[in-house]
Amino acid sequence: GVKYIPISKESLPNHIKAARDSILNYIAETKKSSVVNGKMIFLQGSPKLLKKEGIHIGRLSGIVAHHTPYYLKRNQLPSFQTNCIEEWEKKIDAIVEETISEKMTLISGIPPWVKMYFEKIKKKTGKTIKDVFPDFELFIYGGVNYAPYKKGFEKLIGKRIAGIELYPASEGFIAYQDSQTEKGMLLCVNHGIFYEFVACDDFFNNNRKRISLADVKIGINYVIILNTNAGLWGYIIGDTIKFVSTNPYRIIVTGRVAHFTSAFGEHVIAEEIESSLNDAVKIIPTQINEIHVAPQVNPKK
């Protein structure tokens, strides 16, 4: 469903800053500045905004589209008109037509959206993405776990490609991948968010204890709680994370609070299921598009 989250004048620049820094970190680490010389696409929601009681309302990606830094905007695709198309299939078709002959170096979006875009290009040309966009260098993604999509993407692209994982949310930009060699994403600790955490094992207890960054430990699953300069206090976004480093603070997203099953006290979380699936496809090469997990408390057989 739709949720309305405040974005203040104080919080909006932090979304832009974190997204910008993710690209700048990549350039600083790899010394490959050519990634910003070609065309780049950000698959996002419509930038059309409604106005109610003097307040602009829209999708986060659409709002942010109005504030793209000028040095990125000059090479940004698609056009504003194409970006405003509401019907997703028509929008992707229009984006394909607009970008297929361009020198694309950077492509960004939620993996399912980008997958649809790549599939339409392959259907139209009969070629892999590396043959259509030989200068394509960097894939920026977020929103869902990329691991289940990785093999499918490598097949569509035709080669391995550098990637940057982002952890943006309407509530605040939480983390981004700052290294091609280190595991995890760098927690944004100077971006208008004060973080608190509750260990997942204690989350459903009445006496659950919140802790600050000073007390977190590596390897423990935490529910993340946000206090922001947009006006959110003690806000539970529903995600679970795990620290892989505390100097600097680096995290991985392990799932959702609601995505667990414990019919028999087993406390199975999304991270464990996805890890098992990844191990399985290494043994039996296959591609998994969708999964469903549920306990059979009273099976018929």
Question: What is each PLM-predicted segment?
Answer:
Residues V64-K301:
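Active-site glycine/GP-rich loop and adjacent strand/helix microenvironment
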